[in-house]
């Protein structure tokens, strides 16, 4: 099987970024918020990631980026995953979360939506079906699908042996599959 290689994104510039500038945020009052050492991604070392993948390794990235001076910056895990998948043209991206997928009712795991198109995901956000932390997760995923380089994004929860393979082989088998 595949062999994982743990890296943090700032290692050898695997993930490049810039410090997020202060800005006014919804619900944060009128003054700009300084995000500290939070960064926004500007690029990846696709050659290094490709080399690792080509050698049968699976890069496991801790969500840090490095700016031009080498300063480590914290970046959102979903953003890193979606942008790496897009940069590499991944056929599938699996996001593991605390719920078994996108739920119609966050209190009812049986309300899992098995598949969603981008249009359906946007509608579910707009009509309030999707709430909380699932909104930015879907928004980032929609962005990754928009360029056409990622085939499908699978959002899954607690998975057992063989579940990831089942989800990839049958979209929505154990989670929610988001497709263009």
Which residues make up each language-model segment?
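C-terminal catalytic "cap/lid" subdomain
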Residues: 1-180
